[in-house]
C-alpha cells in the first residue's frame, strides 16, 4: 500500500490563512541512534566523509502552528498563548521546570553547523501529530492548527563545512532517504497541510490479482462459481464470506463484564460464547490490519490475543552499507508493528521471523510481508444480525486517517492504536446498550482497500445515498474551501473521489437498521452515538442504503440534512459508480526465472564441514536466532488471560512452542460448588489468608491453545509439500500443549502467492492435498485467507502458507515448555523422517548451491506421534518438550538447553553420519523424561510404529554448564551455554544496533536479565508463598470502580483481580459520571489499562487534563480521594500519571478539594522514557520496603517478588529533586526495581532491570497509605499460571500468587476502616 498514498490527482489545499509558527526546543535532549551513527561517520578521520567536528549537541524541536497573527485583539492573543502553554504542559512542562523552551542549545554561526529536520509539513500530519491534535480537540483547543516533533543537532566545524557527499550521508542516515524533511527557516511561510488527507489512485480495479486469487480459493467467476474452500473444508462452516470460512469453537466460560455501572449487582458472569481464529498475510501490511478485518467477520468480536510473523529478503548487498541499510529497514518496520500492537491492549502471544536470500527460489521479488493472526471471543447473542435492505444507515467508525507510507522507516505515519482501541470499545458498548439484532452489513474486502471498495463490499444490491455535510471534517472542510469555479458537480466529485473514496484508511464500516422500538430508552443511532461518546470514538452517519446503484452524493453543505431526514427522497448532486470487475480470460502464469528442476542429491561436501561452524551459522541466522528484540518489546500479557506467552525459563527466552489464552481468569470453586457467602470476609484476616493449608485439588484453567506453522522457503520450492510441512509444524508445536481432545484441533491455512507465477490448478492441487492431509491427521481444517503481492510490484516467486492451530485446552498443573527441568533426566527424540538433510532446510540454504525437493511425512505417522505425545503429557511423564523444525535436531537441543539453563550431553552412534542427523529438519519432537520412565515411554511409542532414540542426559543448571555432542569416543562439539546464548542472540543484537542507543548496547549490564530466583519473604507470609483462594459472592459493601479512560483497553485484569478478592467490581467510563456524587457508593477506585496513543507520557497528562475539563468527573474523583474510608490503586504508566496528576501520590500533600481545578502543570512527577527508547515487556523483580505505609501492600512488606512491567516510560522523574528523600522518610515509597538478590539494599540501577535508569522507585503511596500507584502491574500475575517463570522456591504451588494479597488486603481494609453499606 505504499504507492497508494503517493499518487495524487489534485493537490490538497494548504492552509493559507494567517498563522504563527512557534519553535520550542527540548532542554534535556540527547542524540538519537541515527544522529550518533552520522556523527561517528563524520568524526572518523579515516572516513572519506570526515569533518573533524566538535562535540555533538542534539535536542528536540517542537513546531506549533497557531491560527492568527500578532495583530489580533488581546483576548485572542491570550487564548492563543494559553493553548500554546497547554501544548507545552502536555509534553512535560511544569511549574518547577520546562522540558520545552524558547532557548536552543544550538546556535548557528560561522563555525557551527546546525541541522533541523522532522516530518514533512507539506504532507499529511504524522500519527503523533494527529493524536496530540485529537487530545487538543477533546480539551477544547481551537487555535492550534498543527503540532510536529522534530529534531535539531549541530556541531562545531574545524575544517570545511559539509559538502554534497556529507549531505548524502545525512539524507540516508537521518532523513531515511527523504522519509523525513530538512527544516529551513521560513519553509512553511506559504502554508502547510493541516488536513489528514492523502489522495488515492484513480484505478478501476485496484487489486485484480488479489481478487483473482480469492476467486480461485473461495469461489467466483474465475473458479466457475465453485466454492473450492467449501468443498475441501473438514468442518461445517457457519457461513461463507469473501474473506474466508468461519469456524467457531464454543466455550462455556467466557468472561463477561457488565458495561454500565447501573447494571445488576452481579457485575461479572461466565457466559456461553465462541472463540474464532482469523489471520491474513499481506505485503507491506498495515500494522493493525487484522484488528479491522476481524469485525468484518463478526462485528462484535473482542480480540483477546494476536500473533505476528514477518518475511524478509536476507540483508545482502554489494557492501556493508547496503546490508546495514537493509537491516535498518527491517528493524524499523518490525518495531513499528510491534509497538502498534503493544499499545492496542491485545497481547501478542506467538510469531515467527524468516529471511530468504534473494538468490534462492522464493527470495526473488520478496517484498516485506507480514502475517497477522488474531484470536477473538464472541458472545453467543452477538452473532445475531438482520437482513440487509434499503433504508439502513451507513456508519463509519473511527477518525478518518488515510494511509500514507505506513511501513516506510522510521514509520512516522504508522497506524494509530488509539483509533482502533476506541472502535473496539465503541462496538462493545454498542452491543450492551442495544442488545438486539440491528447490524445488516459489515463485510470487508480481503486486503488493504480503498474506501470505495469497502463500501462496495457492504452493498449486496442497490447503492448508497451519501451526504456531503456528513463526510469527515477534513474532507468537508476541503469542499468548503473550493472556489466557485471548482465547486461544481464534476469538481466536487473529483475532490471526493481523490480524498475520500480512493484512499485506503483504517475505518470500520457497517450498516444498521433503525428499529422502531427503543431499548434502554434509546434508538439504534442514539445507542451507537452514546457508545462512541463513552469510548471517545469518532463516528460518522454517512447516509443510507437505496435501490439506486452506485454512490449517490447529496450536496447539503449549505443546509445539512439530519439523520432522521436521510430516509427522504433526494436528487443526487453527483454519482460515483462502483469499480467494475474486469472479466479476464484464462492466461498462463509468467514463466519462472529460475530452473524448475529439483536435484535430489545434496551438493555440499560434508567432510569439509564441522558441527561447530555449521551450528554457529545456523544459530545466528535470523530464522532461528533469538527474537527477543520483538518479543520483549511488545505487549505479551495485557488483560491477564495469557497463561503461556513466547518467553520461557529463568531467562525469559522466546522459545515457547505454543501459547495458551484462558477464557476466564475469575475464580470458581472446585467441582462447580457455589461461592461462599460474602460475609465470610468478616472473619478473615491477612494472616488467615496465608496460613490456611492449600486445598488438595489443583485449579483447572480452561482456554485456547494457539500455535503457528510456516515453511515459507519450502512452500516456494513445492507448494503442495511445503503446505503439508507447515501443517505438520503447527500440529507438532501443539504436541506438548494441554489440549482436551486431539480431534478438536482446528488447522486454519492462510495462503500467500503471486497469481502471475502460479495458476488455478496449482492452487487447487495444494488445497486438495492439504485437505487430504488433514483427514489423515484426524484434525479439522479450514481456509482462512488468500493474499498476494501488491499491485504494481514485480512478479515474485515467493509463496508461503501459514498454518495456525487453535484448540480447546485445559490445565491444572505446570505447562510443558522447552525448559529442561531435572538433572539426570533423559532426552528422547522421535522424528518422521529418514535422517537425511531435508529439502529446503536451513542447512541446505546455507551450505548448498542446489535446492532439493522437500518431502512431508506420512499423515498417519505424524498423527500417531502427536497423539502418543499427548497421551504421555496427560500421564505426567513428560517434563519438557520442543519441536524439531528450522535448524534441525541440534538446534532443538540447544534451545532446550538454553531455555532451562542446563548442560546437556548428547551421544550419537558411531555408525551414524552425525552431521545430517543433527541438521535434518524432518518434523519431530524432543522431550525430557525421568530415567525411571524411559522404558514405559519407549514401549508406548514403539507400539504405535514409531522409533524413538534416547539422545543423551540433562546436566546441572548454570550459564557455564556445557553442551556436548559425542560421536562415539570423539567429542565433536563442546561449548558453554553462555557462548551458545551469545551466538543464538547475535541476530537480535544486530537488530538492537538499529533500535537502541549505543550506550545501552555497549553497557556491561545489558544482558543482566532474568534469574529472578532469589526471593525475600515478609514476616507475614513466611515460607507459605501461596495464599488461599477464597471464592465468595461479590461483597456489595466493597464496591470498586475501574475507571476507563477514552482510548484505553486491557482493564480485564484489574476487574478480575478485585473480583477474585471478593469485591463487587464495575467499569466506569468518563462520560458516565454526570455529578460529583457518582462515586459515593464506591470504596475503591482502580485506574489502569493500556492507552493507544503512541506517546505514553503525553496520554497520561492529557487524561488528567481531560478529567479536569469535566467538572462533574473531576469533583467526583477528588471527593472520592479525600474521603477517609476509600482506597485507590493505579497500575501501569497511565494509572501512575493520573493518580499523581490528581495529587494523590508523589508528594506529602493531600489531593485538592472538590471544586478546585487540577493543575496538570503542578504534577509532582512525570514519567521518564525507557533507556532503550523502546516499549518494554519485562518480567522484573520488585521489592516492597518493610516500612511502606501502603495498606494494600501491608502483607507483602519486605518481599522481593517478580512482576510484569510493560510500557514505554517506566521511570519516575520528580519535578522536585529532593522529593524522593522526603517520600522515603515519610514511608511513601511503595516499591523499587530490584536486582536478582534478596538484600533489601540491592536495588536495580541499570537497564534492563531498571528500564529507565532514572532512580529505582517503581511505586508510590499517599501519606496515609490509602492511595497506591505502581509502574508494575500485579493484576497481571495474581495467579501462578500468569507468571513467566515460577522460581524453585515456590515448588509446585496450587494456590494463588502472593500478589493476590494486595487486592485481598484492600477488601479487608475497607471492611475495617470504611463505612461499607449495602
From Swiss-Prot:
Keywords: Host nucleus, Host-virus interaction, Late protein, Virion, Virion tegument. This is Major tegument protein. Disulfide bonds: none annotated. Belongs to the herpesviridae MTP family. Gene3D superfamilies: 3.40.50.880, PurM-like C-terminal domain, PurM-like, N-terminal domain. Tegument protein that plays a role in the inhibition of host intrinsic defenses to promote viral early gene activation. Interacts with host DAXX and thereby disrupts the complex between DAXX and ATRX. Suppresses the DAXX-ATRX dependent deposition of histone H3.3 on viral chromatin allowing viral transcription. Targets also host SMC5/6 for proteasomal degradation in a CUL7 and calpain-dependent manner to support nuclear membrane-less replication compartment formation and lytic virus replication. One of its GO terms (cellular component) is viral tegument. GO terms for molecular function: phosphoribosylformylglycinamidine synthase activity. Its main location: virion. GO terms for biological process: intracellular transport of virus; purine nucleotide biosynthetic process. Interacts with host DAXX; this interaction disrupts the chromatin remodeling complex ATRX:DAXX and thus allows viral transcription. Interacts with host SMC6; this interaction targets SMC5-SMC6 complex for proteasomal degradation. It is found in: Virion tegument; Host nucleus.
